[in-house]
């Protein structure tokens, strides 16, 4: 996972970490079986991402740029607990809002970008599962 994060940075891929890792950064660590990464859904960013995936040995999966330019796409790489989920959108927050809200952080010793707290709150509120409601209580306290 560390090498994948480093490659996102070195290739200039526009991304933000969302989900439980974002929640942990903002104060509520919770076990998770994956790393959720929202990627900007543009042709340029998608081309860089496909190149990265080919570099990591996912060439057999035949990823295309269009896999990362359409909204509401989810690409899962690997298996839990080290699975990486690549998303092109999240609920309740536009991709532009999410990527603009990102804050610098560190994960496994790698500089990364985490979803901002206000955007995370809007996302949790929009998803609305019982776990998300519990997360909101912590985030807003």
PLM feature segments, named:
Residues 1-141:
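Compositionally biased terminal segments of proteins
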């Amino acid at each position: 996972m560390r090498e994948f994060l480093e490659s996102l940075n070195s290739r200039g891929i526009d991304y933000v970490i969302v989900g439980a890792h974002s929640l942990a950064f903002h104060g509520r660590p919770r076990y998770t079986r994956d790393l959720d990464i929202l990627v900007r859904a543009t042709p340029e960013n998608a081309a860089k991402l496909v190149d990265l995936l080919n570099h990591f040995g996912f060439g057999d999966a035949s990823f295309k740029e269009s896999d990362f330019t359409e909204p509401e796409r989810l690409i899962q790489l690997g298996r839990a607990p080290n699975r990486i989920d690549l998303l092109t959108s999240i609920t309740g927050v536009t991709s532009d809002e999410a990527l603009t809200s990102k804050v610098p952080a560190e994960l496994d010793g790698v500089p990364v970008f985490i979803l901002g707290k206000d955007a995370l709150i809007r996302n949790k509120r929009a998803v609305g599962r019982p776990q998300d409601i519990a997360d909101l209580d912590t985030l807003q306290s």
